[in-house]
């Protein structure tokens, strides 16, 4: 699987790249497709997850789940969306699955300095930890209040990539 900033999503089939989707995205600055992740249970559910910037009139970053059918991505399901974007830079954006099947998603601060990243009620400039339906994952620090319950860490400027360390002794 491969994605391009301009909205293209390809799959390698029989040694050839086959376009399976072309999303309507905003590509100004650092906008576009930010991350793609193949579901760990892909052989059973055929799910592909994409974090991207939507096109006008409401330009937002969106995490969506698609289903792979043949050589197409279909059935887009909205999982979460940021507020309207003000800047063209600092959108971050990386999707990783935890061993328990939950999702970690990094989001940039939309070049709004600390007004978004330090605000625990705003999902921009954060590390989010969610269930597959977009609900907050167990153990998040704001589950009892004081911020958006999907937030796992605050104060991130432009976290465009990260890794999860496998369990070790």
For every predicted segment, state its role.
Residues 29-30, 87-88, 145, 152-156:
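Conserved loop/turn at the beginning of each blade in beta-propeller domains
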Residues 111-112, 143-151:
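Short, well-ordered junction/capping motifs at the entry into regular secondary structure
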Residues 1-114, 161-169:
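Acidic, Gly/Ser/Thr-rich repeat motifs that build Ca2+-stabilized beta-propeller blades
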Residues 62-71, 118-133:
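Beta-propeller blade signature
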Residues 147-169:
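Repeat-solenoid scaffold signature
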Residues 96-104, 124, 129-138:
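A structural motif
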Residues 13, 69-73, 133-145:
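Blade/loop signatures of beta-propeller domains
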């Amino acid at each position: 699987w491969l994605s391009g900033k301009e909205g293209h999503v390809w799959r390698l089939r029989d040694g050839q790249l086959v376009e399976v989707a072309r999303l309507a995205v905003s590509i100004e600055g650092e906008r576009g497709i930010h991350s793609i992740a193949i579901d760990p249970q892909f052989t059973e559910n055929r799910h592909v997850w994409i974090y991207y910037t939507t096109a006008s009139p409401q330009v937002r970053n969106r995490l969506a789940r698609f289903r792979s059918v043949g050589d197409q991505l279909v059935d887009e399901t909205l999982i979460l969306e940021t507020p309207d974007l003000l800047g063209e830079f600092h959108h971050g954006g990386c999707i990783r699955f935890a061993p328990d099947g939950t999702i970690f998603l990094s989001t940039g601060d939309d070049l709004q300095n600390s007004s978004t990243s330090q605000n625990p009620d705003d999902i921009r400039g954060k590390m989010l930890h969610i269930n597959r339906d977009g609900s907050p994952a167990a153990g998040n620090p704001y589950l009892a209040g004081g911020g958006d319950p999907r937030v796992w860490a605050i104060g991130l400027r432009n976290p465009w990539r990260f890794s999860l360390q496998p369990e070790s002794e």
